[in-house]
Amino acid sequence: METIKIKQANGSEKTVILPVRGMVGTLHVGSDRYVVCCKAVISNKKVRLMNIYDITEDNKDQYIYEKNGVEYLTDEAFNKFMRDGELYSLRKNGTWREVGIPTRESCCIVTFGYANPHLDPDF
């Protein structure tokens, strides 16, 4: 499986396994946030990372909004990143859990290290 290395707030790196089908979501690493989009392009063992967008204080309103303490992708981000894919959530061990074809409202942000329990009750 394809992996990416994410630098954590304490300076160490964590290897994250990418899914083998389309994915859009965000990674939280300490105070750093990234919108990630990838898609399977070669085989079930190779995926191509399409985009990683760093979310900064200056641009975060373009990509995420908060409702009831939960972050969601904005319409702009959802339409930009979602292309015939399915949403995957990041588990604590660095693997992805498929959560199905999302609507924008169900495209809930799953953070690096913890998840929204209503989206991933097994987390």
Name each model-derived stretch.
Residues 1-34, 46, 50-123:
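Mixed-charge, low-complexity intrinsically disordered regions
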Residues 42-43:
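Residue-level recognition of beta-strand termini and adjacent short loop/turns
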